[in-house]
C-alpha cells in the first residue's frame, strides 16, 4: 500500500523570520490536509538563538551537526535519514537541504522558498535549479528578478507572501514622548549602527523620543555608542516572537533603516498592531506593504536626516500619526491575513504531482573540500580538521 502524500519542511533551527513564518503557516493550515513534518537543522558551532516556540506539526525532527568540523557527506546522510519516507513535498529554505538533495533523492517534489531579496537566495536558486520543481518568492520584485535569472522557469516561479496573524492588541495612543521601536538583527545590513545618529538628529530638532531596541548581533556594541542620552534607549536583546508581539501595542513608530530586506516580518507585525513604519525605501517587498505618506514613510537607505525628518513629522502632528496608524493596520488586515496566505500555500502543495520534475541523472555537489568524501570516516575527518585547523569552504549559515 502506497504511503499518503505529506509535506516536509526543512529549515535552520534559528530564531527569526524564516522559522516564525513557517510556524504561522503550520498553525493556520487546514485540519484535514496532508501531514506536515518539520526538520530543524542545528549547527552546534553557530551562536544563533534557537527557535523555541511550538509548531503545529505531525512530526518534528532535529538534525544536529558541527560544520565545518565534520565530513559534509556524513551531515548530509544524517539529514537525509531525518526526512520521512513517502511521496509529496519537500520545502527547502536554505543551503544545507539543497546540498543534501544533490546526492540524496527523497522522492519528493521540491519547493524552494526565497526568504529575502538577497543575492544569497538568488544564487542558491540558480545553482540548484535542476533539483527544484517550484520556487516561491515573497515579493513582486523578487518574482520579476528570479524570472529574469531563470526565464525558462517563469511558470514555476510563484509570488506567494507570508502573512501575519491579526494583532491581539492594537497600539494605544501615547501621551508623552514618541515611542520608537527597532526589531531585528543588530548588524549593518539592518542599519542598527544608524539608530544613535537618527536619535541625535531628532535631539537637534528639539524632539526627545524613547527607544526600544530588540535584537542582538555583531553590531551590538557599535549600536550602543553615540547616544545623546543613553538612558533613552532600552536594550532588550533577542526575544521570542511572542515577546516581540506583546511590545508593538506600546509603541508608535517602527524604525528600520535597513540596506537590504525581503518582506520584513517586523513591518507586517508592527503595522498589524497600528505601529507606523519608517523604513528604508528598498527595491524589494517594502513597497508591497507600505504606501508612502499614507501608511508609513520610506526614507532613502542610510539617510539619517530623512529618517529623523519622517519621525519628527509624526511627533509634531499626532493627528497624522493616528490616521497613519489606522491606515497601517487596515493595509495588513486586508492584504496580509495569515489565514488566506496559509491557504495559498496549501493550494500550491496540492499541485505537487503535476509540478513534480524528474531528478537529473547526474548532479554535482557544489560544497566541501578534499576531506569531504563519502568514503572517509567522519571521526577521521573531525580529528584531522581539529589537528590541522583546516576549514572546509562549505556554507556557514
Residues covered by each model-derived region:
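Conserved acidic donor-binding segment of nucleotide-sugar-dependent glycosyltransferases
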Residues: 291-293, 297-304, 313-318
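A conserved mid-protein helix/loop that constitutes part of the nucleotide-sugar donor-binding site
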Residues: 17-24, 178, 182-201, 218-222, ...
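Short alpha-helical donor nucleotide-sugar binding micro-motif in glycosyltransferases
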Residues: 238-239, 246-251
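Short His-centered aromatic/hydrophobic patch
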Residues: 91-97, 114
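Nucleotide-activated donor-binding/catalytic signature segment of Leloir-type glycosyltransferases, i.e.
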Residues: 223-239
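Donor nucleotide-sugar binding/catalytic pocket of nucleotide-sugar-dependent glycosyltransferases
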Residues: 131-168
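Aromatic "clamp/platform" in nucleotide-sugar-dependent glycosyltransferases that forms part
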Residues: 259
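Short hydrophobic beta-strand element within catalytic cores of glycosyltransferases
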Residues: 276-280
Amino acid at each position: 500500500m502506497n504511503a499518503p502524500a505529506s509535506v516536509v519542511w526543512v529549515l535552520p533551527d534559528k530564531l527569526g523570520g524564516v522559522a516564525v513564518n513557517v510556524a504561522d503557516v503550520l498553525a493556520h493550515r487546514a485540519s484535514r490536509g496532508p501531514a506536515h513534518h518539520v526538520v530543524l537543522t542545528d549547527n552546534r558551532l553557530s551562536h544563533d538563538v534557537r527557535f523555541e516556540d511550538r509548531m503545529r506539526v505531525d512530526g518534528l525532527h532535529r538534525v544536529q551537526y558541527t560544520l565545518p568540523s565534520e565530513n559534509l557527506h556524513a551531515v548530509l546522510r544524517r539529514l537525509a535519514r531525518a526526512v520521512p519516507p513517502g511521496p509529496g513535498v519537500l520545502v527547502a529554505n536554505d543551503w544545507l537541504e539543497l546540498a543534501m538533495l544533490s546526492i540524496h533523492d527523497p522522492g519528493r517534489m521540491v519547493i524552494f522558498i526565497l526568504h529575502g531579496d538577497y543575492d544569497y537566495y538568488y544564487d542558491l536558486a540558480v545553482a540548484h535549479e535542476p533539483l527544484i520543481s517550484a520556487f516561491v518568492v515573497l515579493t513582486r520584485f523578487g518574482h520579476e528578478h528570479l524570472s529574469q535569472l531563470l526565464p525558462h522557469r517563469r511558470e514555476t516561479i510563484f509570488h506567494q507572501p507570508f502573512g501575519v496573524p491579526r494583532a491581539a492588541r492594537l497600539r494605544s495612543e501615547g501621551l508623552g514622548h514618541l515611542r520608537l521601536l527597532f526589531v531585528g538583527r543588530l548588524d549593518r545590513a539592518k542599519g542598527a549602527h544608524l539608530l544613535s545618529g537618527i536619535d541625535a538628529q531628532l535631539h537637534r530638532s528639539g524632539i526627545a523620543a524613547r527607544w526600544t531596541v530588540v535584537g542582538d548581533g555583531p553590531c551590538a556594541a557599535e549600536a550602543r555608542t553615540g547616544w545623546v542620552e543613553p538612558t533613552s534607549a532600552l536594550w532588550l536583546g533577542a526575544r521570542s516572537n511572542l515577546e516581540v508581539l506583546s511590545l508593538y501595542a506600546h509603541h508608535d513608530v517602527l524604525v528600520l533603516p535597513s540596506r537590504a530586506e525581503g518582506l520584513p516580518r517586523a513591518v507586517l507585525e508592527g503595522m498589524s498592531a497600528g505601529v507606523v513604519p519608517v523604513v528604508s525605501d528598498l527595491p524589494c517587498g517594502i513597497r508591497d506593504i507600505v504606501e508612502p505618506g499614507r501608511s508609513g514613510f520610506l526614507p532613502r537607505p542610510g539617510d539619517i536626516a530623512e529618517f529623523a525628518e519622517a519621525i519628527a513629522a509624526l511627533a509634531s502632528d499626532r493627528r497624522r500619526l493616528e490616521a497613519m496608524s489606522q491606515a497601517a493596520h487596515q493595509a495588513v488586515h486586508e492584504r496580509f491575513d495569515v489565514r488566506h496566505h496559509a491557504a495559498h500555500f496549501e493550494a500550491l502543495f496540492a499541485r505537487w504531482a503535476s509540478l513534480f520534475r524528474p531528478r537529473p541523472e547526474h548532479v554535482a555537489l557544489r560544497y566541501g573540500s578534499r576531506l569531504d568524501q563519502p568514503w572517509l570516516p567522519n571521526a577521521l575527518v573531525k580529528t584531522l580538521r581539529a589537528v590541522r585547523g583546516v576549514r572546509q569552504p562549505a556554507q556557514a549559515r
